[in-house]
Amino acid sequence: MILADMIRLINLRLQMFGYTVTEVDSSTIEYQAEKAAQYVCNFCNFNKCPDDIPGALKFVTVDYAIGEFLEHKKTFAPNTLSMLNLDMAVKQIKAGDMDTTFAVGEGSKTHEQRLDAFINYLKSYGKTELMRHRRIKW
């Protein structure tokens, strides 16, 4: 996996969540991308990082980097996260005749609680995939 591709995917994914990436964010995104790649390489015992990360772990690595990025922003610049759309969560999906219900405005969670849950999801997503690609270290 090439680091530049991962940074491009991180920027694209952040836009999907309603976050506008600025020039100020570029160094933090690059750092978090390298940190996420190193985490995956250490967990799976890959020798060459990020070159050894297979395509199957690309999105796991990207989501981990985004979780780290959002946690960093929440700590140091929480006002910049107000543009994130955390209200549109899927409540129910019905397969027969396709019926999708969104949980808009439901529940008593605050914006910060929803953000914390979202960050935790991004940082823990893909543990099964990581376990599948783990190598024995001699």
Language model features with spans:
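Conserved short "hinge" loops at termini or chain/domain junctions
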Residues: 1-59, 110-138
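Amphipathic alpha-helical interaction surfaces
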Residues: 38-46, 63, 67-75
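Short loop/turn elements at secondary-structure junctions
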Residues: 67-138
